[in-house]
Amino acid sequence: MSVLNREQNLVINPALGGTALWRFACGYSPKDMEAQHAPLPLLFIALPIVLNERFRDIVLGTQKSRGLSAFAEKFYLTKFKEVEKDEIAAISRGVPQYRKFTLNSIAVAIRTNLISLDADTARILPMHHNNIKNIPKSVKDILDASEKLGIWCRGTDLAAVQNLLSVSL
């Protein structure tokens, strides 16, 4: 295995992906709103966004209260020089590219009791909301971005998410 492949496996692995999806589910279903759970298809947009450093930085740099539309808007405004207008297409391309990885990450998250899948409703619920302590900043950023993305998706219906991010789920 090459050094690059080994580094990718250390950073992009189903355990990290599963943990990020758990934080997404926590954002979507906060403790005080446990009856509202994330639709399974939404999990397929989370990893292509939060595991991409550029997109993750944009999520982290967007105010939580502004929502998903403010994140998507940054791809269309010319004043944001760090983002090219056609980069939102990279999210759309990332969804099918990450599909198998996302499925593996979901499986890990379920096996480790981070999330549960309601087979009747195809919704994901977090098994707990405990914070993880003493983690590297790079991992914390991924988890924080994932949770924020979950919060934003909670306030946006599935069709609007697909439209804003130009994705097909």
Each model region followed by its residue ranges:
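Glycine-rich, aromatic-bearing surface loops/beta-hairpins
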Residues: 128-169
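Minor-groove-contacting beta-hairpin "wing" of winged helix-turn-helix DNA-binding domains
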Residues: 122-127
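Short helix-coil junctions and helix-kink-helix linkers
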Residues: 87-99
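Short beta-strand "wing" residues that participate in macromolecule-binding interfaces
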Residues: 117
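Basic amphipathic alpha-helical segments that dock to polyanions
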Residues: 102-113
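Extended amphipathic alpha-helical bundle segments that form the ordered cores
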Residues: 68-80
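Short, extreme N-terminal leader segments that mark the start of a protein/domain
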Residues: 1-21, 157-169
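N-terminal interaction modules that seed assembly of large macromolecular complexes
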Residues: 20-69
